[in-house]
Amino acid sequence: MINMRSILTYSLAILGLICFLSVFFESNNPQIIFSAILIGMMGFFRINPLIYQKISFLNDFKLDLCISLSAAFFIIKEISSDFGQTLWFLSICAWLHSWLAVEKLMSKESKIFPLVYSFGIPILFGFWLLFFWEVITVGLKIPTVILPPPSMIAIKFMSSLDILFADFQQTFMKSVLAGYFIGCSSAFIFAVLIDKNDFLRRGLLPVGNFISALPIVGIAPIMVMWFGFDWQSKAAVVVVMTFFPMLVNTLSGLNSSSLIERDLLNTYAASYWQTLFKLRLPAAMPFIFNALKINSTLALIGAIVAEFFGTPIVGIGFRISTEVGRMNLDMVWAEITVAAIAGSVSYGALSLIERLVTAWHPSYRLKNN
């Protein structure tokens, strides 16, 4: 049976030899020639299993990783010149070498592997995503108004840190955090009240469902008229967007405990609040954290979209809308990068807290086995 590692090995052998042959017809750069020859030799060794099995270091994942990253570095340096077939073949070979290194690493039993799996592989994947973004946009000469390369975005990002930080403060630190806290906490309180009172369940759930179906582009202008052009109106939009997901997930979590567990507490004459804090809330924690993680991204999206409908001359949404009109796409992508980093950090922080709080829960233990 052919596995993924075998497919990668044979693909690298073929592409490496093609890269080795094509370099003599196109490139004059010694670094590119060296990379192509090295990858071509590795391809020859992979075709010849006797050599490949006898030389042990050829099967080491660190060698494949070093080859891939070195080739990527040389390609980035050469990318501004004429981008021929050799660089395309070399780019694909470098990526496959990195993939093969990950496959080799996953086959090893190591104490550091969980750490590498959690951080190293996502970082490596992100690196190659940015690498091919750069290669495709520059190599195919795509206009920057359509898609700027990551290098151009990085330069704009570093030269506009003061503007980006001011926009981050306005959108995230004020609108998102305030709306997120109010929306999630109020939804949690209402979920407990609805769980205790059947009348509220029948009355509030349909209303919450109706509000959640309202389009954000319809809510945002109304909130601006009610609360003004500053961050308060954007926080109100975030409250509306985060309320219903938190409410539904909390209610589902409160009902996730089994009937046998509740009957056991009833036999000890436990009150409603004792059952809630001793059994039902701990059992609901995975559901609550799911809602918190979902809302961490919804809140940011809601605040940014709300800023399109009226805001002071600061904010991520305001900056995106104005810079698009000026065709400054590098600044638009820099703002998108800020939003992506803020959302990812928020989601990651909540995931870490969830791991600490729900480490005892069966769902967490099953997920990690």
What kind of region is each of these model predictions?
Residues 236-240, 274-306:
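Transmembrane alpha-helices
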Residues 24-30, 78-83, 138-182:
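Periplasmic/extracellular loop-to-transmembrane helix junction in inner-membrane transport proteins
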Residues 42-52, 198, 255, 290, ...:
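C-terminal transmembrane helix and the adjacent membrane-cytosol boundary/short C-terminal tail
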Residues 1-118:
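Membrane-topology segments of multi-pass transport proteins
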Residues 225, 253-254, 301-338, 364-368:
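Glycine-rich helix-loop "coupling/hinge" segments at transmembrane-helix boundaries
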Residues 203, 249-288, 317-320:
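Short cytoplasmic-facing helical segments at TM-TM junctions of multi-pass membrane proteins
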